[in-house]
Amino acid sequence: MALQFTEREFIPVLLGGDINAYSVARAFYEEYQVKSLVFGKYQTGPAYRSQIIDYTPNVDIDTMPVMLKIVNGIAQAHADKTIVLMGCGDNYVALVAQAKDADELADNIVAPYAPYSMLEQCQKKEIFYELCEKHGVPYPHTFTFTAQMLNAQGEAPAEVLDQIDFPFPMILKPSDGIMWWQHEFEGQKKAYEIADRAELEQVIRDSYASGYTDDLILQDRVPGNDEYMRVLTSYSDRNGKVRMMCLGH
């Protein structure tokens, strides 16, 4: 059976090409029967060739000049519509928020994001754990490694690592996920399960040698597979009040 589409008073414009972009486009289709315009970097990924998506690759879509030219062009071409602009990835959200703050988006574009200064703080993991501490939300035992702890050779001193009071294997992840992916290096991962001291020293050395300058978060590993994971998604209005929440398992 062929998919059915309905013309609405808005057009979803999504930035990104991975499963996040596809999931948002699917949600728009299931609720409103609209086709989303999706812009990713490459001709690949879950969003590419999907029947519910009009996908356009552009290797520079994650740069401000190219993003503005594309989305403002869409807004101009569809002046009678509201353009709902969403970033499907931390870097795209930051890009859109910065453009919104600078008032560089066309008047008929809606970008549902808080000011960039607030987003920048919220996406840093050590800030998140400070909020957990403040509000009594439990989280794994954590040690924060900073660039200032490195010695002159760009390595983690033994006396610093000796302060970690939880065992291997441990989890290591960057505090600033946006900056992290801007400095690629061999073997780079979103998060690591560190087996021993030698691997910990190597990952720290490689991370900062790449040009990454923010903190690294080391945590006690919580045992169990993905069946024990949960994800909480919430929506807040323009006044910062949470209006809905959805727990995923």
Residue ranges and their predicted role:
Residues 121, 126, 144-150, 158, ...:
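Domain-scale recognition of functional cores that engage charged ligands
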Residues 34-37, 139-140, 216:
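Hydrophobic anchor at the start of a short beta-strand
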